């Protein structure tokens, strides 16, 4: 039983492509096929997306099939901390549930402390000491006035600092061993342990009864947790437990020169581009060449049957739903099948792009085509024309359940042929007209739905308002309206009103070239809810209804946008059309042409990490951060 004895600790260390996750999958499969009850096994991953992918892949490996792992606990490290703090015994210790301080709340908290006279250096030193203590699992009494005021401010919000979360959970379990007995497991496996904070690793250890198996790269740190410490959390954990990690050799990268390959079908998969690690949101994806007649014929002519490329826990999906025609970023498992799969794709005539650790992506960035998920939405790397390379590295929520990637790619081609912006092309569609490309009727229908929803929201509130609710509560809106909201909103916001936005709040209708288009800040008397973000901090009250609340909420947005702007330094306004760049005027120091590596640098999860939002609680938060490449305040 967890919490009653010290588990046997083992660490698998290896670089990318060394098979760490595969080893964990095999260990989990061996336990389950050997008769281990699912209640005696728990898997912890660095993120909730990675946890979901691990569970899917494991389901295809166990002999009893995916249904046998439905009850298996595969959770993120943060979710495990939440579970510990939500336990009734933890509640008696701390008095409130596990709510983490939002990044925007922290920004405004610090701004208030600074305005109250606290020096920047004093505050930084106080936070550094607190972070160092929390990272190791300690809950010290704050020393000095700055630290006390910061902790008091956290208490006033009724929230924990995100670094404090693991420390609070660990101390709750240490003080109440019965929590670990209820929530723990005999065997605990941890993937990407180097990306998990040290306090959370100690918490995970407390939940392990007999075996604790961790996998990660001791040389790759998570700057969010390890910035104030020497060495990665995994390396320090190994040193404290006197455990010598087992080193796994990295698999050789032996790809055809013109092949772009992502190594494995995991939600957070690292791709080496210009020696910079970029994380893409991927799904459990494989390619079945037999699903496409032309490709099958081409493969057969080359002596290669239209056989399935990947079988390592992957569900084949129709080729049309995965790729932009003839341009594909293929997601296949690592291992001995890799080179063979690449050769089959090459024989089938699929245009691909080189991307290895020592070589940057070459060729036209538009060829870095698509990465599709099996869940809610599709990542595409598409461009309408050379002038607008960054237009629609799309992250729009037009999920494969409704509209295929090929249909969206057709829209891009349609726009390029007519020298139109993608949104303009979408707005011009008429479902009753002859279809200019596959999927046009459905896209037009979705556009009409978006317009109707916005109009309904405006009538309901009696003012010009885009009222966007939680993605969890209104999937129809968040999945269908994002790519068209800028055009739709133009019917409700005149140029005069947009000018009022500039004067009153300092924002404007953003013409975003990366991520999701169009977010709105509040007018002087009419507040608008920012697209997709439902964390309870968007301006929802007018100035007349609640002046103090309205002003405070506006300050929250200013703080977050200011932080985003400072990191981006406006050097990533790549691909902006000339008229857009000119409109930005003196606010933009430099506008440069986008390259494929720039596209990679703006991967949503990288931007999230840089903004201190390691794991937002909603996809809306990710959508917002992905679209902050915009006009500055």
List the predicted regions and their residue ranges:
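Conserved helicase C-terminal RecA-like lobe
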Residues: 381-598, 607-610
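A short helix->loop->beta-strand "cap" motif at the edges of active sites that frequently abuts
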Residues: 69, 208-212, 564-566
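Conserved P-loop NTPase-based nucleic-acid remodeling module centered on helicase motor cores
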Residues: 10-13, 38-126, 148-152, 236, ...
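A polyampholytic, Gly/Pro-enriched intrinsically disordered region
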Residues: 90-108, 234-237, 282-286, 368-401, ...
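C-terminal, charged and often intrinsically disordered regions of DNA end-processing helicases
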Residues: 34, 48, 304, 609-633
